[in-house]
Amino acid sequence: MNRRLSIFVIILFFLLPVAARAQVTGSFRFAQLTDIHLNPNNPKPTEDLKRSVEQINATPGIDFVLVTGDLTEEGDRTTMLVVKSILDQLKVKYYVIPGNHETKW
C-alpha cells in the first residue's frame, strides 16, 4: 500500500507543473440550432431554419454553430440534403451532432 501511495505522489509531483501551466487561450462564441424537424409536408420549419441562418450570419463575433440533433422529422436523405443546403449558407463553420430522428431511432 505504501508503494502505491509513493508512486501516486511521484506521478502527482510531475503532473502538477503541467496543470499549473494550463491557461485559457481566449474565449469563443457559438450559436446552437436544435430540433429543427424539417418536414417536406410543412414549410414552417424550413422558413424558421432559413431565418435562423440569416440571423446568425448577421450577428458579429460568432465563431461556429452547433447543430444538436433532430434536423429532420423522418431522417430521410432528401430532407437532410435540404437542411445541408441551408446550413451551407452559414458564414462560419458548423458541426452537426445527429439526433434520434437522424439515426432512425
Write out the residue ranges for each language-model feature:
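Extended active-site neighborhood of metal-dependent phosphoesterases/phosphodiesterases
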Residues: 77-105
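N-terminal active-site segment of His-dependent metallophosphoesterases
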Residues: 18-82
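Bacterial N-terminal signal peptides that target proteins for export
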Residues: 1-8
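Bacterial N-terminal signal peptides
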Residues: 8-17
